[in-house]
């Protein structure tokens, strides 16, 4: 160490000198004090090496007072733990042999500013001026009590106190080991390089508390912190860890002032109630503030509403919850892993006023512990306080339970002792007592030895420090439980790098073992996505997945693939049911009935015509075209079975071919017939020569030519768009996915269907036009009128079909309605043709065979004459109103001679 007279040494300590000039009047000891004068504000134990001690013997004072009430456990127990450790080390022949450890122990009064004043005692020996030139009034030298040289400090308790003291001690390179300060700020080795601690940093504690919160499935909590380094840093570390791990949000973050005003704690409770869902409250506060928070909660009638989680400052202490058991019930607290030191229990229980005079506060403790007074003058008249007898015994006449930090106080003293022992072994090998290299002790060297210690603590736990002077994180987790009117802290788990929590051991007020809730929003139901509140990821609104959406994850709804629909709870997708028109469907009953009856009737007509093929009626109907027409009618009925059959490649191909082909065959045959009649009568108006292409062979050629156009179009369609079946999921994609269906059908769109039937419709319309034009032929040419009625009726059927078919395109039963409408319309069209053109003939053939005989024949000349005279005598009224020639004009000219002289075409009236 540089000489004290050096300029650099004084310059480095200039700030402290200024500080001392401010606090000089309040210095705990002053120069010139007579030797042996008792230090009433500190404990002084002589030794070869002196250790400082800082303990909160008293609480924080009020109304301008520095100190308040005595703290029995947190103050006296811890102080006695240091004395106990010093006794053990001094009596240990293997640890610091022939070297006695002394102590200078001060009371911090739980206040950082007061602790700063007291700690100046530790550096007093380093900055005192030499008093040899000072002379008393009598001329003699003054009697000076030289202050001891403190080489290391044990303490302090509160983090804010340790921070304040550490800022001074580092200037004089005095190592400091705390037994209770856990603020994360103290891990900053650049600012607090001479600070170490045998308790873990609140960084570990905060991580442990976050893990507990997550294990209890709480995601919305409030925090309460005492103003100062411990509380604020602890809460800050908790918030930081909760953000890093995610899943925990802070509802309120409340700070308790150092000097709270009246009603401050009631205000804190009201603020916590603003977010009533955040029932879990994380507390980083000193025990006085903890107690006042609990009292305020009781005043607000909120017993059982809040679930407290206290840091190690709460731990397993009785003082914060005394007479507040119901409010504190269920509180989860955390405490660095510790064990009760049995030797200390025996030591402390044996302390009396006689054998513990070195503890200047023990008498005050005695009075407080046994509720008595040592001085008779202190007794007030009428008071129930008795006089102390000095026969009281701790643990017998008063309750006793070892304070939680006793183990760490002892470990801190032993850490200093082991470091000094290692330092003495290296610097003074083989020397008994201190050697010049350790007189004085170099604080920088001592710090290195402190950071390198590794020994088993008083409870068997390893004591080590990391590069920042922190101890490893090891915690016990407690819950304050009320059982059968008795309260106790029960161990429910531990934390060493990761959490071990036995939830089954926990007990909650009002709900037993059921975990209480402290959440911002209730969990969303299956099929609902979370829409988080901005800046508060633990709060959300639940929005249901709608339509065809399903829940992908907690935050996303996604539309199912086109061929699927969401499950009932919308957590996935399932295939959309595929439907088709079944044979047993009610929609198929009528089409199948009409088709079966129609096919039977058609076959009956065909059989009848074949059997009576050579009779006049069959001949007169034009046998060739009649059979072609019957084939078309049969195909129209047969198409129903193709439309109801399950769609596949074969079925769809046959549908394309026969759906329009049957109608094309029917209307092509009818068109050929009406065209023949029309041409015959039109030709007869102009000349007596027969029109061309009226022979049966010509009629068949014309019919098949018309049919071939339909077949050609179908072939082109097959080439351009090969036939196949599809499942149409859009056809019945209802708003409610529960009713969605996929329709198995042939790949024939409505437009394709129009094109497919369009040619047949064109033939039908053309045939209808010719039927209108031939409505005036004579009654004897009796096929013209039935064909006309057939076409009129058919047009009506198809005019009704169009709005029904296309008007139901958006219906849920589109498949059934359109298929039924189409098949019924085709069957009705076939039935009209079959009924009007063939049933009368079959009736005559079967029931009136007497009419199935040849009638008078007419020549083409008679027809031409009738057609010519119809124009001539229209005004004379010799013709019927519809222009038909009177039957008297239609003589049957059968004379053979006449037939050989003139060119006539002979035919019967039914052959037209």
From Swiss-Prot:
Glycosylation site positions: 98, 301, 454, 484, 569
GO cellular component, one term: plasma membrane
Membrane topology: Multi-pass membrane protein
Domain of life per record: Eukaryota
Gene Ontology terms describing biological process: adenylate cyclase-inhibiting G protein-coupled glutamate receptor signaling pathway
Location relative to the cell: Cell membrane
GO molecular function list: G protein-coupled receptor activity; glutamate receptor activity
Cystine pairs: 67-109, 249-538, 372-388, 428-435, 520-539, 524-542, 545-557, 560-573
Keywords carried by this UniProt record: Cell membrane, Disulfide bond, G-protein coupled receptor, Glycoprotein, Membrane, Receptor, Signal, Transducer, Transmembrane, Transmembrane helix
Residue numbers on the Cytoplasmic membrane side: 608-624, 672-699, 773-786, 848-912
Regions that span the bilayer: 587-607, 625-645, 654-671, 700-720, 752-772, 787-807, 827-847
InterPro entries registered for this protein in UniProt: ANF_lig-bd_rcpt, GPCR_3, GPCR_3_9-Cys_dom, GPCR_3_9-Cys_sf, GPCR_3_C, GPCR_3_CS, GPCR_3_mGluR4, GPCR_3_mtglu_rcpt
Keyword Signal assigned: yes
Extracellular side: 33-586, 646-653, 721-751, 808-826
A Pfam entry, by short name: NCD3G
The family this protein is said to belong to: Belongs to the G-protein coupled receptor 3 family.
Role description: G-protein coupled receptor for glutamate. Ligand binding causes a conformation change that triggers signaling via guanine nucleotide-binding proteins (G proteins) and modulates the activity of down-stream effectors. Signaling inhibits adenylate cyclase activity.
Subunit details: Interacts with PICK1.
Name recorded for this polypeptide: Metabotropic glutamate receptor 4
Source species: Macaca fascicularis
Classification lineage: Eukaryota, Metazoa, Chordata, Craniata, Vertebrata
Gene name of this polypeptide: GRM4
